């Protein structure tokens, strides 16, 4: 069954080149692909990271964020991913969006101009009100942390 998204939110975008505008690859995609804004190819050696410009600035509405997430194909085929995933672009940020890619592979990875390098996912933000407390309600899990379930 095909569903169209009638509930969308307009994100005003300033961009160096219209071809760099983020886009959804399929009708049900949650993430919009974002491209590298490079004048020439850029090499990321094995074990190294690079800050990749997108040539794009956004006006995200108050009460929202955009999360920067990896593209699964880059991770699977080249062991390249977004270093601080998910990255958060706050609603009050107006600078250029840049993506930190890291090469976990054994071969150098070449980022080409216009290459799809990450995905942008719009999300609503609910802010927490942290309140100083004397104690916390107990749970079955308790203080069991990393690896406690096996």
UniProtKB/Swiss-Prot annotation:
Its EC number is 3.6.1.23. Pathway: Pyrimidine metabolism; dUMP biosynthesis; dUMP from dCTP (dUTP route): step 2/2. It comes from the Bacteria. SUPFAM superfamilies: dUTPase-like. It comes from Protochlamydia amoebophila (strain UWE25). This is Deoxyuridine 5'-triphosphate nucleotidohydrolase. NCBIfam families: dut, PRK00601.1. GO terms for biological process: dUMP biosynthetic process; dUTP catabolic process. It holds the Pfam family dUTPase.
């Amino acid at each position: 069954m095909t569903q169209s998204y009638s509930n969308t939110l307009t994100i005003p975008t300033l961009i160096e080149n219209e071809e760099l505008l983020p886009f959804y690859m399929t009708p049900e995609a949650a993430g919009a692909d974002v491209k590298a804004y490079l004048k020439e190819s850029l090499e990321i050696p094995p074990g190294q990271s690079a800050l990749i410009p997108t040539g794009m600035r956004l006006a995200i509405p108050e009460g929202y964020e955009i999360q920067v997430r990896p593209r699964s194909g880059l991770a699977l085929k080249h062991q390249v991913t977004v270093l601080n995933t998910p990255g958060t672009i706050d609603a009050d940020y107006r600078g250029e969006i840049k993506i930190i890619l890291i090469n976990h592979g054994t071969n150098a990875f070449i980022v080409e101009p216009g290459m799809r390098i990450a995905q942008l996912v719009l999300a609503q933000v609910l802010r927490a009100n942290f309140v100083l407390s004397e104690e916390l309600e107990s749970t079955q899990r308790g203080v069991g942390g990393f690896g406690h379930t096996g």
